[in-house]
Amino acid sequence: MRDIDKHDIDKKELSETDICDQFITPALKQSGWDQRRQIRREYSLTPGPIIVRGNMSVRNKKKRKFADYVLSYEPGVPVAVIEAKKNTHTVSHGLQQALGYAEILDVPSVFSSNGDAFASHNRAAQPGQEIESQFPLADFPTPQELWQGYKAYRGIEESSDQLLLQPYHTDGTDKEPRYYQIEAINRVMEAVVKGQQRMLLVMATGTGKTYTTFQIIWRLWKAGKARRILFLVDRKRIPEVERLFQVGFSFF
């Protein structure tokens, strides 16, 4: 029976947060990921389902979904998901959970770690390429490597970076696009760089259609892809639209 190393005991006693702080985040920073701009911890995906009972409704926050890490090449351009687990689990234990989040965000690179190493799943693997693998913490891919993988996954040409990486409009508050708004906005940008002339977004009431449209217009205008824009809206929505556009377009 082999002697148990003290370091092993300490590591297995660490919480999931400790694993993130002491092993995963340092590994990401070592590979060139900017902690402020590119690394998001506990990224909220869904706030939980709403349960209706008669005339009352309540949100079940226990079933909310959030990713331990979402990596973005630029803010608002997610390229990878990482799921962290305690060291009592295997390296790949969180891959299946991370895959679900990656499908929501539609990103190709999926990772899991227990602090010992990384396990990866490549949703964009080509014939002959490995779909899943494991590698040391020190070998995590750089931002440029995952960005190239994202562009290959989306079928985007090298010359398209200017529009795809055009920053979102910010108003100095904490407000930012929700994950599905980011998905819609980025898909429109990708369609434009591929030469599509017509795009249709179908969004339900209350999902932020006006805000999403404004961000699309902002990014197209700032990237020099659109100079004359006609925005049509139902007359009942005019006051709401005016408020948003007066604030947003005061910067133009």
Segments predicted by a language model, with ranges:
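ATP-dependent helicase/translocase motor core
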Residues: 1-228, 233-252
